[in-house]
């Protein structure tokens, strides 16, 4: 059974449909990249999966007790406190239905927070506001991971990161046992992480069911076929125009 299933989902914000009766299934332990042009609605789809938005029509089926964590493109400017406080906040403010049964009492919560901070190689007592951009993103990732999510949603996770921070993130995600669904314009990161490519194009989702290199080959073949089809059509149209000018 899929962790999450989108069935005939449609959504618009006043203009054209961002999502037009799309279907999507996410399975356990997948690493999926969502690609598409700017403004296509990629971030919107991530927020739908995270439960922040409600579709105009269609159904989102979630496995019982499913927990998702969402890391947005931007770092909140107003966020303040120590690393420990911010990560703990991710547990305290989570929907109770999404908090795993093994982390309910105070000792279990404290242990889980400390465990995630250690896993992310962070200093629990460090002040968030003085950290580098890379470490701030790592803290926000820890805040999401503290609830043990089955699906990790990442929106441009390498934005403003230095090479060392990107390398660390790649290594972490390759070890991560949950499902990762992410958006990125970083082609090297995409190639290293994704094992499944989904393309959002004019409201429609195309599941290429392959890694990035295979996607490039298949996509080029599709574009070549379309170009050939249009070339044939143009030649036919040109012949018809000549025929019309001859008055036959």
Could you say what each language-model-derived stretch is?
Residues 99-101, 245-248:
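Charged, low-complexity surface segments at secondary-structure and domain boundaries
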Residues 231-247:
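Short cytosolic helices in intracellular loops of multi-pass membrane proteins
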Residues 1-231:
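ABC ATP-binding cassette signature C-motif
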């Amino acid at each position: 059974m899929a962790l999450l299933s989108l069935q005939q989902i449609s959504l618009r914000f006043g203009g054209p449909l961002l999502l037009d009766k799309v279907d999507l299934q996410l399975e356990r332990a997948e690493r999926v990249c969502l690609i598409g042009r700017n403004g296509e609605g990629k971030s919107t789809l991530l927020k739908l999966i995270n439960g922040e938005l409600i579709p105009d029509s269609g159904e989102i089926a979630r496995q019982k007790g499913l927990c998702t964590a969402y890391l947005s493109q931007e770092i909140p400017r107003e966020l303040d406190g120590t690393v420990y406080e911010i990560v703990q906040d991710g547990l305290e403010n989570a929907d109770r239905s999404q908090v795993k049964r093994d982390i309910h009492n105070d000792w279990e919560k404290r242990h889980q927070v400390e465990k995630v901070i250690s896993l992310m190689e962070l200093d629990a007592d460090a002040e968030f506001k003085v950290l580098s951009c890379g470490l701030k993103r790592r803290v926000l990732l820890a805040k999401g991971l503290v609830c043990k999510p089955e699906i990790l949603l990442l929106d441009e996770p390498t934005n403003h990161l230095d090479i060392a921070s990107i390398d660390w993130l790649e290594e972490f995600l390759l070890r991560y046992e949950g499902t990762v669904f992410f958006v990125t314009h970083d082609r090297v990161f995409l190639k290293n992480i994704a094992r499944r490519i989904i393309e959002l194009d004019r409201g429609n989702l195309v599941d290429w069911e392959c890694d990035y290199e295979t996607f490039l080959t298949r996509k080029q073949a599709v574009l070549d076929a379309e170009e050939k089809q249009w070339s044939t059509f143009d030649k036919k149209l040109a012949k018809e125009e000549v025929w019309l000018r001859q008055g036959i």
